[in-house]
Curated annotation (Swiss-Prot):
GO CC field: cytosol
UniProt cross-references to PROSITE patterns, sorted A to Z: RECA_1, RECA_2, RECA_3
Entry protein name: Protein RecA
Gene: recA
Keyword Iron: no
Xref: HAMAP family: RecA
Compartment annotation: Cytoplasm
Spans annotated as Disordered: 334-357
């Protein structure tokens, strides 16, 4: 239906005034192309990038990564930092747990000389530092480890045993309101690592919940549930862990997909193992008995040897990675303006099917 000409003129004048006052892009039509492109940073895991649909974690958004202890939360975020630094981006790590190991970070490919690090005394201080870094417009990725360690100032100054009901939740709620707009303007990715707690007296459904109240769940564009599903052994020695990540909320692509990969101790995500597995699954790598072949050339007998070949030949690894991304980041992952139910959590939509990569 055509809009009245006078109304069109009035609308154009209003839009012009808004853009003049608040900047270009402060208001736009939803169908415009520029609003649909989402810049992303790789997670360091090919299968997780594919499960996320957009090819990685979205810039200018809030992301929550949660899971049990020793499930790989910090390792995953350090891999994100390493990937961002390789693209020349500036990263900051807010270490509220005071537990960041620079030697381990360096092993995962993090340039520790150029990583900004803060160990704040209180939760308010940590969130103020986040806000200041965001408003500077010079920091591309900020990690907060973890929400559970963001202790309000009143709790630190009080006695052990004092009741501070809802204090952390109020602090997080206020911070989310303040940070969300600034992150979008600065195009900064903010990742919160969170821990799991059990709800008491839950007879039916999932008793697990995350700390810090509900605000983070609502403001996060992506929520990842990371779990350790098994151990990787060489003989009797445990050398890593099998890991599964579920995308329980996704505002930039289809949710409810999951990725499985290996985390090797001292090395991080086994990207070459993912390339072999996905290559075989999607017929880019041929497997005959124990032998693996790529483009007709044998690359190794057994998965370990095939992985070593890819590790020693980065050009072939990059070529295989590119082919898999082009093949698997397909039409179904494109943003749709009216994707109903796209941002709900897994808890709310129990029984949804998950696509695995």
């Amino acid at each position: 239906m055509a809009i009245d000409e006078n109304k069109q003129k009035a609308l154009a004048a209003a839009l012009g005034q808004i853009e003049k006052q608040f900047g270009k892009g402060s208001i736009m039509r939803l169908g415009e192309d520029r609003s649909m492109d989402v810049e992303t940073i790789s997670t360091g895991s090919l299968s997780l990038d594919i499960a996320l649909g957009a090819g990685g974690l979205p810039m200018g958004r809030i992301v929550e990564i949660y899971g049990p202890e020793s499930s790989g939360k910090t390792t995953l975020t350090l891999q994100v930092i390493a990937a961002a630094q390789r693209e020349g981006k500036t990263c900051a790590f807010i270490d509220a747990e005071h537990a960041l190991d620079p030697i381990y970070a360096k092993k995962l490919g993090v340039d520790i000389d150029n990583l900004l690090c803060s160990q704040p005394d209180t939760g308010e201080q940590a969130l103020e530092i986040c806000d200041a870094l965001t408003r500077s417009g010079a920091v591309d990725v900020i990690i907060v480890d973890s929400v559970a360690a963001l202790t309000p100032k009143a709790e630190i100054e009080g006695e052990i045993g004092d009741s501070h009901m809802g204090l952390a939740a109020r602090m997080m709620s206020q911070a989310m309101r303040k940070l969300a707009g600034n992150l979008k303007q600065a195009n900064t990715l903010l990742i919160f690592i969170n821990q799991i707690r059990m709800k008491i007296g839950v007879m039916f459904g999932n008793p697990e919940t995350t700390t810090g109240g509900n605000a983070l769940k609502f403001y996060a564009s992506v929520r990842l549930d990371i779990r350790r599903t098994g151990a990787i052994k060489e003989g009797e020695e445990v050398v890593g862990s099998e890991t599964r990540v579920k995308v329980v909320k996704n505002k930039v692509a289809a949710p409810f997909k999951q990725a499985e990969f290996q985390i090797l101790y001292g090395e991080g995500i086994n990207i070459h193992g993912e390339l072999v597995d996905l290559g075989v699954k999607h017929k880019l790598i041929e497997k005959a008995g124990a032998w693996y072949s790529y483009n007709g050339d044998k690359i190794g007998q057994g998965k370990a040897n095939a992985c070593n070949f890819l590790k020693e030949n980065p050009t072939i690894s990059a070529e295989l990675d590119k082919k898999l991304r082009e093949m698997l980041l397909h039409k179904g992952n494109e943003l749709k303006p009216a994707a109903a139910g796209n941002s709900h959590d897994e808890d709310e939509l129990a029984g949804e099917g998950k696509e695995e990569f």
